[in-house]
């Protein structure tokens, strides 16, 4: 199942979560993710590091595409977020890693809402 939300962020649901525990603005979330460019080049992965990532969602700590997309997932859900440049790193990109205005693809698993 696929849906497109705010900012053109596309959510492809890969496996369901509990269907009832969704993060709200300001919640601390624990996520496993792998980020790739459209050409398939991996630029970051919490899975490879063996350490899940934590952030407060919806408060500007992460890219806008995560702030928009992660609250649509329930705990345990796996999804692919396709995030257009303006909702990723925008015109600055991330020097040496992510080109300016690049669309990013994240395979994410919402492990926990704290």
UniProtKB/Swiss-Prot annotation:
It catalyses: [protein]-peptidylproline (omega=180) = [protein]-peptidylproline (omega=0). PROSITE patterns: FKBP_PPIASE. Disulfide bonds: none annotated. The keyword Isomerase applies. It is found in: Cytoplasm. One of its GO terms (molecular function) is peptidyl-prolyl cis-trans isomerase activity. The keyword Repeat does not apply. GO terms for cellular component: cytoplasm. One of its GO terms (biological process) is transcription by RNA polymerase II. Pfam families: FKBP_C. Belongs to the FKBP-type PPIase family. FKBP1 subfamily. This is FK506-binding protein 1. It comes from Candida glabrata (strain ATCC 2001 / BCRC 20586 / JCM 3761 / NBRC 0622 / NRRL Y-65 / CBS 138) (Yeast).
């Amino acid at each position: 199942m696929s849906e497109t939300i705010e900012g053109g962020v596309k959510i492809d649901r890969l496996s369901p979560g509990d269907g009832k525990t969704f993060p709200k603005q300001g919640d601390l979330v624990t996520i496993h993710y792998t980020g790739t460019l459209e050409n398939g080049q991996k630029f970051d992965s919490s899975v490879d590091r063996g350490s899940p990532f934590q952030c407060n969602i919806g408060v500007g700590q992460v890219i806008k595409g995560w702030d928009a997309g992660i609250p649509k997932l329930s705990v345990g859900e796996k999804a692919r977020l396709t995030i257009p440049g303006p909702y990723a790193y925008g015109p600055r990109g991330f020097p040496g890693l992510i080109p300016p205005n690049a669309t990013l693809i994240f395979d994410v698993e919402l492990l926990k809402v704290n």
